[in-house]
Amino acid sequence: MTAILELVEIERHFLGGNKPLIILDKANFILNRGELVALVAPSGAGKSTLLHIAGLLEKPTAGDVMLRGVSCAKRSDNERTAIRQNDIGFVYQFHHLLPEFTALENVMIPQMIAGFKKSIAEERALKLLTYLRVSHRANHRPSELSGGEQQRVAIARAVANGPSVLLADEPTGNLDPVTSAYVFQALSALVRQAGLSALIATHNYALAKQMHRRITLKEQKIVELP
């Protein structure tokens, strides 16, 4: 299998009191091409920190993040930003859509920032919204959408630039069980259809069991679950 994302001996320490607070300690992980992996761990275990490091939003205290075999350890902030824009998509528990723009515009904007022409960005955005069955709400602002619709638009935005990796932090955690299952099915179907590799943090073990692998955080290490 081809490794897309590798976390190598990752350490993350925070200063606190007389000794540092250790969140991650020589943590290792490989996400292979086309894999859908669940990150299952209790609140406060370090899931968000792990995702932020994997997504180059946060620098580890030590260790390296490898994306498609290339080290990111010594990349400048501008280089890390460019990698995020082109290769990494994010979905959060709360959608973070721009409230003043429509659903369609929210999916177009990151593409235009990346250099796509407006007409191409619009065409790509509509295709994604159609695939996620929310194109009929394309001209509505986020406040006019249901929670499930908001998350589907957020998913479309996350994959709009054609990333190789999708990272999701509790993407269904704020939804009711029925909507949660529907949004997860839409997300997993899109990941598989687009050939993405995804690491998804969730408290929902029933959803986690539907993924290829499951990992957790134990004693500041990444551990495989059955």
Curated annotation (Swiss-Prot):
Root EC class: translocase
Localization (cell): Cell inner membrane
SUPFAM superfamilies documented for this protein: P-loop containing nucleoside triphosphate hydrolases (SSF52540)
Keyword Oxidoreductase: no
UniProt keyword annotations, A-Z: ATP-binding, Cell inner membrane, Cell membrane, Membrane, Nucleotide-binding, Translocase, Transport
Membrane topology type: Peripheral membrane protein
GO biological process, one term: protein localization to outer membrane
PANTHER family: IMPORT ATP-BINDING PROTEIN, LIPOPROTEIN-RELEASING SYSTEM ATP-BINDING PROTEIN LOLD
Protein name: Lipoprotein-releasing system ATP-binding protein LolD
Species annotation: Bartonella henselae (strain ATCC 49882 / DSM 28221 / CCUG 30454 / Houston 1) (Rochalimaea henselae)
